[in-house]
A protein has these predicted regions:
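DNA-dependent DNA polymerase catalytic subunits
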Residues: 1-169
Length: 169
C-alpha cells in the first residue's frame, strides 16, 4: 500500500518469497534481521506517508488539537506547534492542508509529551525528537502487523516460540 513506508514494502516482498519457500525458521530469522536493519534507519525512511487535510477542523487554540483528531493530523498540528515554539518558522515550513507528510510514533515521556509527530519529508534535528522515535512500535505497525496476518493464516509465529520441553531439557 502507498500508506506503507517504501523500505517495508520491499522487505514484505522479500518476506513473501521466504514464506513461500516453506521454512518458518528462515522466515523468523529474516524478520529478526529486518528488524535490526529497520532500527538503524532514519525516521524519514520508516515513517508512514500520508496526505493531510482538515487541519483547521481539528486545530484547537488551547490544546493544539481536538479530541478524536486523526493521528497524522495530530502529528502535523504538533509539528507546527513545535516549530513555532522554537521560533524555526523561517527555517522550516509549517505543514498545511494538501501537503504530503510522514508520521512516526514517539516514546513518552519526551520534549512534547506526545506519542506522534508528523513532518514534511524530513524530521528536523532541531525539534529534538530523533532520540524518542519508538522503533519497536513503528516496526510493529509498518511491517509486523501486516506480515502476521499471513503467518497466522499458515500457523506460523513471527518469533521462535518457547515450549515446555525447552524448560526441562
Amino acid at each position: 500500500k502507498s500508506s506503507t513506508p517504501q523500505v517495508c514494502r520491499e522487505a514484505m516482498n522479500n518476506m513473501f518469497k521466504i514464506i513461500v519457500s516453506g521454512d518458518e525458521e528462515k522466515t523468523q530469522e529474516a524478520i529478526k534481521m529486518f528488524k535490526d536493519y529497520f532500527k538503524s534507519l532514519p525516521p524519514d525512511e520508516i515513517a508512514f506517508p500520508r496526505g493531510i487535510t482538515d487541519m483547521t477542523k481539528w486545530s484547537d487554540r488551547s490544546a493544539v488539537y481536538k479530541k478524536g483528531t486523526p493521528i497524522h493530523v495530530r502529528g502535523a498540528l504538533l509539528h507546527n506547534n513545535r516549530v513555532r515554539s522554537l521560533a524555526l518558522e523561517k527555517k522550516y515550513q509549517l505543514i498545511q492542508n494538501g501537503d504530503k507528510i510522514k508520521f512516526i510514533y514517539l516514546m513518552v515521556p519526551n520534549v512534547i509529551q506526545e506519542n506522534v509527530i508528523s513532518f514534511p519529508g524530513h524530521l528536523p534535528e532541531e525539534l529534538e525528537l530523533h532520540k524518542y522515535v519508538n522503533h519497536d512500535l513503528q516496526f510493529e505497525k509498518t511491517f509486523l502487523d501486516p506480515i502476521k496476518i499471513i503467518l497466522d493464516a499458515i500457523g506460523w509465529a513471527a518469533e521462535p516460540r518457547a515450549d515446555l520441553q525447552q524448560f526441562f531439557f
